[in-house]
Amino acid sequence: MDSRPIGVFDSGVGGLTVLKRLVEVLPGEDYIYFGDTKRVPYGDRSEEEIKKFAKQILNFMREQKVKAVVIACNTTCAVINKSEYDVVLFDVLKAGAESAALYTINKKIGVIATTRTVESKSYEKNIKIIDKNIEVYQKACPEFVPLIEKGLYNSPIAYETASKCLKELKEKDIDTLVLGCTHYPLMASVIEEIMGENVKIVDPAIKLAYDVKDYLLKKDLLNPQIRGKAEFFVSGDKDNFIKTAEMLLGEKIENVLHVDIEKY
């Protein structure tokens, strides 16, 4: 048994979709969530910047004495080398690739993600490790994250933007679509409506949450309490973060603390 918290981080509010799944699967755990709201979005930043940000955030997480860290940001997963860090890391991108390879029947998978994640070809590489015969079609949708951070994920402009971005993938006869950015599940209803009922929408956070549970069980690191708590930290704007967190998690978020992450 281990009562230390689990760390979860993302560039902003997107990782809250991962936290929600973790709480559903592991309700007894305590969580430390960090959203880098000052520097969001990560998708168009350089690899060097993202690596620097990840190092700062993981230093912060070490200070919080976490037992593991969930990288709830596909862009970060796509560029960092996990072996460089001495903390247990869980990778949302790998979980998404494994889920998609499992679900596809016609072996045609679409991936929507940030520009940096698409350019890295990380999803394609991870999927083809599982099955080299799967065709992977990737599409960058950089307009999604700014809309979601502003709370406009179910708005008419979100539908219009998603329709344009998904048009190319709709023509590829895919049967599976990976939401390759943790912000995107907030637009899942819009995306599902556009893609139609014959396309399976994959939220990587579902498998990821069970991967974390399996690890904690295997290592005897589960928190013995019945109901845990979550603490929230941000580097910038709190207002939209709190609004989205309360909507997703279904509870009042009283205490969101500001962190000067650049000092780490």
Curated annotation (Swiss-Prot):
It is an enzyme of class 5 (isomerase). GO terms for molecular function: glutamate racemase activity. It comes from the Bacteria. Keywords: Cell shape, Cell wall biogenesis/degradation, Isomerase, Peptidoglycan synthesis. Substrate binds at D10, S11, Y42, G43, N74, T75, T182, H183. Signal peptide: none annotated. Pathway: Cell wall biogenesis; peptidoglycan biosynthesis. GO terms for biological process: cell wall organization; peptidoglycan biosynthetic process; regulation of cell shape. InterPro entries: Asp/Glu/hydantoin_racemase, Asp/Glu_race, Asp/Glu_racemase_AS_2, Glu_race. It catalyses: L-glutamate = D-glutamate. Its EC number is 5.1.1.3. Gene3D superfamilies: 3.40.50.1860. Pfam families: Asp_Glu_race. The active site is at C73 (proton donor/acceptor), C181 (proton donor/acceptor). Provides the (R)-glutamate required for cell wall biosynthesis. NCBIfam families: glut_race (TIGR00067). Belongs to the aspartate/glutamate racemases family. This is Glutamate racemase. The gene is murI.
